[in-house]
């Protein structure tokens, strides 16, 4: 399946793996790229040299294209932005901030820049800054979210910009991919399903929690102070929401969650850690290789789109 995104990025399938903090490291990124999609290394709050090491390790596992997600609010964002150029990375996705200050440097180095957006206004602004494409991410996704659903956001962004649009949020099988294409997207970004891939280094408890999740198992914390995060319900989210309803300050609530994502991902504490996952978790029932996942999803999507 060829689109402007597959041509631009040099990939076989229009599937991009989300740049998830503590999850999107070199093993996963390389596996997705080897399977024909675009793997991403999640920069998160990591120092530049850590990201550099991840890039080099990924290159030992694949010679296919992969990218880096740069979290712009990270205290290390300046260093990571430079490392991307120094290491010859050709695709960057961005989130949590404005990439404008890095655009000239990245464009001069031939880097394709793809910001994640949660509104039409932001998509237009990113196109004005010179973005090559945008990821329109709905609130069904795991982690930090906006207010619009994927179903409503994607077609509005498609109508508003001339650059390619990648749909994200609530996509975990071929039906979701086909639906995104019918809305005008030219690729999809998938996170939660890849978390449970065999190549993912996430703790087995985390994977099992996603696989056993039901349709109503996700919740959103942080709405009160304008920092909504979608994750799976557990003791930590219940305590957070209770304190939120009691009117606790952002600082008090932030303290409660410090280190909890790492606790869940690396230590397997899915009761007191933050188990970030999208609403699609209820649809995920097994652990597979990235190659199996992508083959299954694309086969289903192509069959459905062939009926149209």
Which residues fall in each region the model found?
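Residue-level detector of alpha-helix initiation sites
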Residues: 23, 171-172
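Conserved active-site-proximal phosphate/metal-binding subdomains
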Residues: 152-166, 172-308
